């Protein structure tokens, strides 16, 4: 397979666990899923040959994940809501509370991620509104077989995906790429573990929508 000239989104669809590899190398396969592996790797000065070897190894591994290219879109929508929307609604309020505690207790330390709670609160508010619009407007259109007429709502949802991606960049800057400092307390470490889990979930969530659900819906499937 010609990996280097494939888009990150296409590779994430075709190769199980490629998303984890991309995340390890800071390759944006969700909002930036249309760029080729070669272009994305060159931007980050990554070894393209090594990446291709890793992708080849992943492609030969047995896997049991769902083939969302073949599943009905109603099934994919149900999965997105239960696996990601509901999960984000659980994750974010707890992360905000932990961030507030860390800033309150450790605010005088130079390594304290001051402003993190406010940024997470903004993500919570905007993502809650975003998911509501998907569940109340866009997803019902797709479920009624009107996906090919949903280019307007899809454009808005993709723009909002880009916006939350920019917010995640701010979170990473505030947290030294979500790396707890030496001597961080248990709450601080739990916060960063939770943020990393949230970022992984959100990237997979956006990937499924941008690179699978929306294109299939626009094709009228």
Curated annotation (Swiss-Prot):
Any Pfam family hit: Hemerythrin
Keyword annotations: Cytoplasm, Iron, Metal-binding, Stress response
Subcellular location: Cytoplasm
Primary localization class, coarse: cytoplasm
Subunit structure: Homodimer.
Stated role: Di-iron-containing protein involved in the repair of iron-sulfur clusters damaged by oxidative and nitrosative stress conditions.
Coiled-coil regions listed in the entry: none
GO MF assignments: iron ion binding; nitrite reductase activity
Record-given protein name: Iron-sulfur cluster repair protein YtfE
InterPro entries: FeS-repair_YftE, Hemerythrin-like, RIC_family
Lineage: Bacteria, Pseudomonadati, Pseudomonadota, Gammaproteobacteria, Enterobacterales
Keyword Iron: yes
Single GO cellular component term: cytosol
Domain of life, source organism: Bacteria
Family: Belongs to the RIC family. YtfE subfamily.
A single GO BP: protein repair
Species of origin: Yersinia pestis
């Amino acid at each position: 397979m010609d990996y280097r000239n494939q888009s990150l989104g296409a590779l994430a669809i075709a190769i199980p666990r490629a998303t984890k590899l991309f995340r390890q190398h800071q390759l944006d396969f969700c909002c930036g899923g249309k760029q080729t592996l070669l272009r994305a790797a060159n931007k980050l000065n990554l070894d393209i040959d090594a990446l291709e070897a890793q992708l080849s190894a992943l492609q030969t591994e047995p896997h049991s994940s769902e083939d969302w290219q073949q599943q009905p879109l109603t099934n994919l929508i149900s999965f997105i809501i239960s696996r990601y929307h509901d999960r984000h609604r659980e994750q974010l309020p707890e992360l905000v509370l932990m961030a507030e505690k860390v800033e309150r207790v450790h605010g005088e330390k130079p390594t304290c991620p001051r402003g993190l709670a406010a940024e997470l609160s903004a993500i919570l508010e905007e993502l809650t509104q975003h998911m509501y619009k998907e569940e109340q407007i866009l997803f019902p259109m797709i479920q009624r077989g009107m996906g090919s007429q949903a280019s307007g709502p899809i454009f808005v949802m993709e723009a909002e995906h880009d916006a939350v991606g920019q917010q995640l960049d701010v979170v990473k800057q505030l947290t030294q790429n979500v790396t707890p400092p030496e001597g961080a307390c248990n709450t601080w470490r739990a916060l960063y573990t939770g943020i990393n889990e949230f970022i992984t979930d959100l990237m997979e969530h956006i990937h499924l929508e941008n690179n699978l659900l929306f294109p299939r819906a626009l094709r009228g499937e």
